């Protein structure tokens, strides 16, 4: 069979009524009972990942703070990316006891006390099983970790974990007051995920409680 319906254009998804996977299954009449994607890495891929990362005696923490397409107008999106002050605070807190590998493109913001890890996707995913802690945004890293059976802490801003996330994760929501909503620049979604600054609705740029994030990471 050929499946070509785009669930992103369905009313259920636009209204954020259910998880995206459930929306896709319902469009095709496929029963869904909560299955999650699974990724399989072969022994050679895992071996190459160890060769690339060269593990030492420190536990590894994986960190993804920014995402999005390389051509988006800004390298920082308020709608998806972790505020830089929060990200740096986490890096400072864990840098003395963890080797922090920062998943980012070369054109994305740089943090102190971390190592950038820039690898092809499959090689990067093979690094995930080497990690002890994982802190991500709503982007590809959280999905890769989930498909490998790994729990993560995920920070959410514009999108909702009930639509794009996983119950096994610790999902962190903004700890800020909404004071304004301006949706003029969005189409088919409440907020432009690339982060149109005119749409920023909160009363502060520091959207998360850093202690809440640290407390969830301690449980991993």
Locate the predicted segments by residue.
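Catalytic machinery of carbohydrate-active enzymes
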Residues: 1-220
């Amino acid at each position: 069979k050929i499946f070509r319906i785009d669930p992103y254009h369905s009313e259920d998804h636009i209204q954020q009524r259910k998880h995206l996977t459930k929306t896709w299954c319902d469009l095709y009449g496929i029963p869904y009972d909560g299955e999650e994607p699974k990724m399989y890495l072969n022994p050679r891929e895992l071996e190459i990942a160890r060769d690339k990362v060269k593990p030492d005696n420190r536990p590894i923490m994986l960190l993804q703070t920014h995402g999005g397409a390389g051509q988006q107008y800004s390298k920082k999106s308020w709608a998806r990316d972790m505020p830089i002050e929060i990200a740096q605070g986490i890096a400072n807190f864990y840098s003395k006891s963890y080797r922090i590998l920062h998943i980012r493109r070369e054109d994305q913001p740089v943090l102190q006390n971390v190592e950038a890890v820039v690898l092809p996707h499959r090689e990067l995913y093979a690094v995930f099983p080497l990690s002890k802690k994982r802190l991500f945004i709503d982007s590809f890293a959280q999905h890769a970790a989930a498909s490998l059976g790994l729990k993560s802490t995920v920070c959410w801003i514009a999108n909702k974990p009930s639509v794009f996330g996983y119950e096994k994760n610790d999902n962190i929501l903004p700890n800020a007051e909404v004071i304004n909503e301006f949706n003029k620049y969005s189409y088919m979604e409440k907020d432009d995920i690339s982060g149109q600054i005119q749409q920023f609705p909160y009363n502060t740029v520091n959207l998360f409680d850093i202690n809440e994030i640290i407390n969830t990471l301690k449980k991993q």
